[in-house]
Amino acid sequence: MAVFPWHSRNRNYKAELASCRLETVPLECGDYHPLKPITVTESKTKKVSRKGSTSSTSSSSSSSVVDPLSSVLDGTDPLSMFAATSDPAATVTVTESSRKKRDKDDNSFVGPDFEPWANKRGEILARYTTTEKLSINLFMGSEKGRAGAAASAMSEKVRTRLEELDDFEEGSQKELLNLTQQDYVNRIEELNQSLKDAWASDQKVKALKIVIQCSKLLSDTSVIQFYPSKFVLITDILDTFGKLVYERIYSMCVDSRGALPDHFSPENVNDTAKETCLNWFFKIASIRELIPRFYVEASILKCNKFLSKTGISECLPRLTCMIRGIGDPLVSVYARAYLCRVGMEVAPHLKESLTRNFFDFLLTFKQIHGDTVQNQLVAQGVELLSYLPLYSPAMGWIFQCVSYHAPEALLTEMMERCKKLGNNALLLNSVMSAFRAEFIATRSMDFIGMIKECDESGFPKHLLFRSLGVNLALADPPENDRLQILNEAWKVITKLKSPQDYINCAEVWVEYTCRHFTKREVNTVLADVIKHMTPDRAFEDSYPQLQSIIKKVIAHFHDFSVLFSVEKFLPFLDMFQKESVRVEVCKCIMEAFINALTLEDEKRMLAHLINGFIKMVSFGRDFEQQLSFYVESRSMFCNLEPVLVQLIHSVNRLAMETRKVMKGNHSRKTAAFVRACVAYCFITIPSLVGIFTRLNLYLHSGQVALANQCLSQADAFFKAAISLVPEVPKSISIDGKLRPSEPFLLEFLCNFFSTLLIVPDHPEHGVLFLVRELLNVIQDYTWEDSSDDKIRIYTSVLHLLSAMSQDTYLYHIDKVDSNDSLYGGDSRFLAENSKLCEAAMVQILEHLKTLAKDEALKRQSLLGLSFFNSILAHGDLRNNKLNQLSVNLWHLAQRHGCADTRTMVKTLDYIKKRSKQPDMNHLSELALRLPLQTRT
């Protein structure tokens, strides 16, 4: 490789600084000032055409200039509202319209306080399972729907639609029998995938047939225990279909005007999209059976937005009435649940249909206890206690939708209607699960009365009390009723024979007891739990509930001594006989009261407190006493690294305060004192563990020593830092994670170079001794192959050596003669400087050569341009070889099309601008030799 000599350009730092200063411009009193008060000008705009072209007129007491921003507004601009306070009528109008809009928006969206259906889906699938065999009808995929040419006449289209649907209903299906639950789920997933595949291949009729077939499955209650899970699986397919249809029609609305806005109106929808939408509704209307017609139309309910503003509000009541034709009460209630779910998604503000669904359900509620249902249960061998919980997911969802943000009067009416029905335990449980906790809590005694009147045979009372307890854990009942509520509930709970039923209820009511009563009542409850769970070691099957009880108790007892004074608390802990559970419970108690920290956290906390104390201690001008305090502190806290770091910083600050007091002119006494401070730091730093902490403290302490004219001590610090660089590991731990160390090493070395500029050479060592030692260490350090930090360091070395070759350095330390004063342009010094520069250049160019690979061309381009900029800033380009090297680097940066064109253009413009400065004519010739790469 050819050797390029380095020639530093001469710098006049004062002149460069003066040329970089901002130009001062006198500001007259009447001119604009950024802090001048803002004057609001009312702008009124008048809408001229539908396309949004406006003509605006502005009125102002101070100016008649038209506001350019007002031309794009359709109405009053927001800032003018505040300026229009002089017109009370306008203010009232704006306020009223804003209130109405806000109220409408509040009802148009479902907030985060509404639990979504997705949260209930997994729970339903896990709870409602079966071991019985299932059957399913699979669509075999007739091709008739896609055959033949498109009919032109309307009657032909209608006949074609009916034939396509009849083809499905007349035998294009296959019944699969004796399926396990998992097989059934897999078949449903296959149907879901078939729907997506058919849609993707533009077989829309086939997709509709699949959805119809799936909807028909919801009329089958042959395996009644599995029906809620079947409903979840089938409605997933319906949701997919509805989404596909909506997105298809929405995509058809994209034209030259762009896509539809989020809140579009039917006027924005083109005729093609409307016709397609109507076609879907006509096809669905052709379905003969009620249940599939209902479900498929409900799934695309949102598409009514494309046809009419009132389409959804008109369809919801009609679909609600359609459900009245479904005879099976279980199928009916889930149909209502699906309609409520779709309604809440597309039009949550339409509360009437939700309320109508609820009251229609109440009218048919007695069917649950009718002969038809009883005969069906007998035929399937299902007991009423197992049948009634099947209604819970659907009823809970309906109640949740109706009660969401419902007024108090409606909730009261709903409760009264439920109260009038017989055998209403199921209804009561749904009310307590869905209504607001505050509503339930304020009427706790009313609900207890209703629970007492319920028939035990239909729905267990302990489940009702559990639901009531859940609400009372979230909201407080009237204070006068609290004890009576606990007594009434516990009378029922304590009589439960099943340990599992008992603990499920007791777990909920323990929190109510802890919230509102003393340790006496809590002790009584714990004693009752021990009494019920100890026989036959029943507690072994209920560890999660028992752990929950412990957490609730300790959450309300903030005093450790009070908790352990509860007589039955320790016997309660004795029930945790499984070792892992016992450890977990004890850990929970310890964290609640002791807040035990890990060892490292504890050290960090102690160190933080000690450091705060050290910084507060001051002996005024008695600096020697201050240093003695720091020496004593070091001996006491030698195991706490953060404290040692703080002590080193404090001693360095003490040395600088001494310099400040002496104004840089040390006496014999103060000179000895600052040397003692420097020695303190030099002795303490090696005891630290963190390598970058040591490196930075060596550098910082060396700077302090240099500022106090302790030159030999400063050299010792810098030599120690240089000798420590080879020990830097490849990665370091930061916040428990391993990070590469090279970026931190690069940052440290760049700071070090800035200090080395002003460090004078030791008379007994060679020229630039510290720089040569540091370059040797950098050369021997093992760098990552994928990293360019080594070359960035060598580039920084070039910057340092260029600054060192100047007649006068950029900055100095007071009363310290740097090398510019010591050598005064000596040829031996400059020759050594040039030698080191050439060595650094060789390293840079060799690295650039190794990057001539496809995967490294981008890095080569960036580094080449960076080195070019370094030569431009620090090199003397009047030298022909250096000039040629810069041209080569320019071409290298652009060779493979990896360079950023904007950066190259700006760089070239900068060169041309600099060429106009005095003694910079040679840059004009350089600019002519630097072509810009064109991309075609």
UniProtKB/Swiss-Prot annotation:
The lineage of its organism: Eukaryota, Metazoa, Chordata, Craniata, Vertebrata. This is VPS35 endosomal protein-sorting factor-like. Its main location: membrane. One of its GO terms (biological process) is endocytic recycling. Acts as a component of the retriever complex. The retriever complex is a heterotrimeric complex related to retromer cargo-selective complex (CSC) and essential for retromer-independent retrieval and recycling of numerous cargos such as integrin alpha-5/beta-1 (ITGA5:ITGB1). The recruitment of the retriever complex to the endosomal membrane involves CCC and WASH complexes. One of its GO terms (cellular component) is endosome. It is found in: Membrane; Endosome. Belongs to the VPS35L family. InterPro entries: VPS35L. Component of the heterotrimeric retriever complex formed by VPS26C, VPS29 and VPS35L. Interacts with VPS29. Interacts with COMMD1, CCDC93 and CCDC22; associates with the CCC (COMMD/CCDC22/CCDC93) complex which contains at least COMMD1 (and possibly other COMM domain-containing proteins), CCDC22 and CCDC93. Interacts with WASHC1, WASHC2A and WASHC2C. Interacts with SNX17 and SNX31. The gene is Vps35l. The chain crosses the membrane at residues 672-692. The modification Phosphoserine is found at S265. Residues 43-69, 87-113 are annotated as: Disordered. Keywords: Endosome, Membrane, Phosphoprotein, Protein transport, Transmembrane, Transmembrane helix, Transport. It is a single-pass membrane protein.
